[in-house]
Amino acid sequence: MAKKSKKNQQNYWDEEFEEDAAQNEEISATPTPNPESSAGADDTSREASASAEGAEAIEGDFMSTLKQSKKKQEKKVIEEKKDGKPILKSKKEKEKEKKEKEKQKKKEQAARKKAQQQAQKEKNKELNKQNVEKAAAEKAAAEKSQKSKGESDKPSASAKKPAKKVPAGLAALRRQLELKKQLEEQEKLEREEEERLEKEEEERLANEEKMKEEAKAAKKEKEKAKREKRKAEGKLLTRKQKEEKKLLERRRAALLSSGNVKVAGLAKKDGEENKPKKVVYSKKKKRTTQENASEAIKSDSKKDSEVVPDDELKESEDVLIDDWENLALGDDDEEGTNEETQESTASHENEDQNQGEEEEEGEEEEEEEEERAHVHEVAKSTPAATPAATPTPSSASPNKKDLRSPICCILGHVDTGKTKLLDKIRQTNVQGGEAGGITQQIGATYFPIDAIKAKTKVMAEYEKQTFDVPGLLVIDTPGHESFSNLRSRGSSLCNIAILVIDIMHGLEQQTIESIKLLRDRKAPFVVALNKIDRLYDWKAIPNNSFRDSFAKQSRAVQEEFQSRYSKIQLELAEQGLNSELYFQNKNMSKYVSIVPTSAVTGEGVPDLLWLLLELTQKRMSKQLMYLSHVEATILEVKVVEGFGTTIDVILSNGYLREGDRIVLCGMNGPIVTNIRALLTPQPLRELRLKSEYVHHKEVKAALGVKIAANDLEKAVSGSRLLVVGPEDDEDELMDDVMDDLTGLLDSVDTTGKGVVVQASTLGSLEALLDFLKDMKIPVMSIGLGPVYKRDVMKASTMLEKAPEYAVMLCFDVKVDKEAEQYAEQEGIKIFNADVIYHLFDSFTAYQEKLLEERRKDFLDYAIFPCVLQTLQIINKRGPMIIGVDVLEGTLRVGTPICAVKTDPTTKERQTLILGKVISLEINHQPVQEVKKGQTAAGVAVRLEDPSGQQPIWGRHVDENDTLYSLVSRRSIDTLKDKAFRDQVARSDWLLLKKLKVVFGIE
């Protein structure tokens, strides 16, 4: 709330005050201008420029790399625009561009309309002016001619008779009538002009509509001609014809398979051996999954070939191949036909009109089929890490066949039991190191489906179980870092997250932070309500399902659980989340599922595993589709004995092979290197033990793997890893991988004022920058990895510009000893923390401390405005004590009070200083400040003047004189400073504006 009020109060003074501030810059030199300072101005400016140059030189490494890559990117965009090449943009960039274009368009339209209206007004004015002048000239000419005619006709009479004088009232009435007539004429002209413009606009719109219609008709004609041509060639097929063709093919296949029909081409000639005919394809290419399936079935049928007579062998095999091809064709076209049948609501009369559209749809379907076949080819061409099971006819659909393991992260507050819960899940089915058990990978634990089946067996009586995925991959390191590192172009590679909440404490600060992070990434998650064993008198049943355990608890335990659960449900609702216990949740998409668990007894863990699989399999099958395209993220950079610097990578899609050329993000630019070794630890061994690693020639997603390669020292944790393919351009991939980092520069303040931010990984740096942006804290420079002396030197440039920002915010990084000493020597504050909000608290406390010191230093110059009325003079002198009422503003202890009088002879303004407020009393009770309306009976004020030259009551000052606080240019500037700005109310700023006139302040 304090932040909000601060923000609102920043605009309390008007432009006039800002102009004042511009004249006397900041209060940093408030006390008295030092004559030496002006003399040494050149020296300071030289020093400042030198420090700026130093900052640029220091910038080195990370920041300069980012700037270079951003410049390169901008240059590339300009070149592409010049060449006229299509520019690939992200969805966000497109939306931003669209909005900007719309804004610009609206601005241009408004400007055009305004200009037209202005021009029309000017034109009308000119026309009216001309008409009035013309009318006046004609009238004057008519009067003149009439006068001259009259004079020539009766010269003697006119000489004798003087002209009759017109009464003043009549003349005024005539003038009014003339003016009215002129106005009517002007209005008439304006109306005519408006009507003309409206008519022109209508005509223009009608013409545009006509042109559109003509263009549409021409396009239709063109399409019709094209359709006729295709029809003449016999290439055009309607939906109905396509369906008929497919139906005929299926019937033919059915007839052949029945064996009642003999086809001449299939009959064997005399003397021909009973060998199965080899299937010859028109193009030599790699086999698709359907062909492999047919091969498998062929091999099965071969086993039973002894029973089948020789003369039927060839026929049966050929028919089988035919049948499988048709089945594959039917499967491929199934989606298309379903869509077609849904859309074909139009009658037969409209068939001819829709033929062109049908043809296009048919072509699109063919392209999709080819693309699908290509994906299958690529997937098959790379051999699998584990032997795949032989597909059965029922599992021929691709969406169930190629699902990969879902990737899961664990988040939550400190000490909620994240690590313990993970250990419990990991330890559940380790059966004496047997094969097929849970395997510990680099940075992740892999649970094969057999282990999950064994663990979730207790759920069978409550829920229906399906197991379509090969397993579950759980990221080992719990917390924000691992989650925020698993990202790809803003969207998370983590498929599902577990948010752990302590049932005893509810939502805590870091839990709320985790919810925000999950919301930003749009990641689905479930809530694990941990520590249910802490409920008083809970009877534990190890590794049981929650529902079974809960049903066996006493009534008191059930009631306590219900009350605590309701409280947490309410807290989640405050964060904008609807939640429900997972087995009572009827709408999984709108309500967050809550699973009560115990990391100690293992109760609720089967429920959690079942829910994770249920959600990922049913709702995320598209995201879990296995693709051959490599998607990998660097989790950590580590030094390993015997391998040098290695990177821990989560491979979420595709294959990685030994010898692959990889591109990744580095501190000093992109790193291009070859994979020397792909390593995973020995099964069921702790990573901390120096065990032998298992070498692999290739690995398949999804898993965690350690990569050993050259030049990995400067690799950035949290960045993407790309593989250079045979058709890829290495330079393009290098630019592409650095694009992730260039976005960080948008968070850096362009004014050059702000704090220096250092983080351990890319994900945590992004999270910290977002947090600082929300808190309105400017950032001058960013960095990754440990803090060294050169990083502290960047922050030292702030000592002159803005001392309150001479701070380093370090998130989860080590600080070098030399850097610490240098920071202490220069007076730079380094804050290091593992939790973002701890950093923020430390920084705000430090800023508040600095402001408090500043307030003490400039308290004498901070004079708050007030207007007083004298009620009673208690003591005239030594000390002067008077009773006053506060008419406006705030009266504080230490405020100098004066009266302003005008000299009757010289008419000059005189300021009579009564003294400084020493103490204030209301009803004999001392107070520090009194505001307007705070007291009705007045306040007793004791005034003392150090000079001893106080004015005398009755002679210099009387009770009718208004008293003011003695404000000056310096006091106004002091109140504008950050240290006092929050304490000055809006009414006080308005009063200051009035007092500036009273005291004649420029």
From Swiss-Prot:
Result for mutant: T439A: Impairs the GTPase activity, but not the ribosome joining function
Q: EC number(s) per UniProt? A: 3.6.5.3
Tell me the cofactor note: Binds 1 monovalent cation per monomer in the active site, which can be sodium or potassium. This structural cofactor stabilizes the GTP-bound 'on' state, and may also act as a transition state stabilizer of the hydrolysis reaction.
List ligand-binding residues for Mg(2+): T419, T439
Which residues does the annotated region (G4) include?
530-533
Where are the Phosphoserine modifications?
S405
Q: Where is this region: G5?
A: 598-600
Basic residues composition-biased segments: 277-287
| Sequence segments annotated as region (G2) | 437-441
Q: Specify the enzyme's EC class, one word.
A: hydrolase
Q: What is this protein called?
A: Eukaryotic translation initiation factor 5B
Please give the InterPro entries that the UniProt record associates with this protein: EFTU-type (IPR029459), P-loop_NTPase (IPR027417), Small_GTP-bd (IPR005225), T_Tr_GTP-bd_dom (IPR000795), TIF_IF2 (IPR015760), TIF_IF2_dom3 (IPR023115), TIF_IF2_dom3_sf (IPR036925), Transl_B-barrel_sf (IPR009000)
Composition bias type Polar residues, residue spans: 27-37
* G1: annotated segments: 412-419
Q: Where does K(+) bind?
A: D415, G437
Q: Which GO terms describe its cellular component?
A: cytoplasm; cytoplasmic stress granule; cytosol; cytosolic small ribosomal subunit; eukaryotic 48S preinitiation complex; mitochondrion
Write the lineage as a comma-separated list.
Eukaryota, Fungi, Dikarya, Ascomycota, Saccharomycotina
Write out the GO biological process terms: cytosolic ribosome assembly; formation of cytoplasmic translation initiation complex; maturation of SSU-rRNA from tricistronic rRNA transcript (SSU-rRNA, 5.8S rRNA, LSU-rRNA); regulation of translational initiation; ribosome assembly; translational initiation
Q: Cite the Pfam families for this sequence.
A: GTP_EFTU, GTP_EFTU_D4, IF-2
Where along this sequence does the record place binding of Na(+)? D415, G437
Q: Which family does it belong to?
A: Belongs to the TRAFAC class translation factor GTPase superfamily. Classic translation factor GTPase family. IF-2 subfamily.
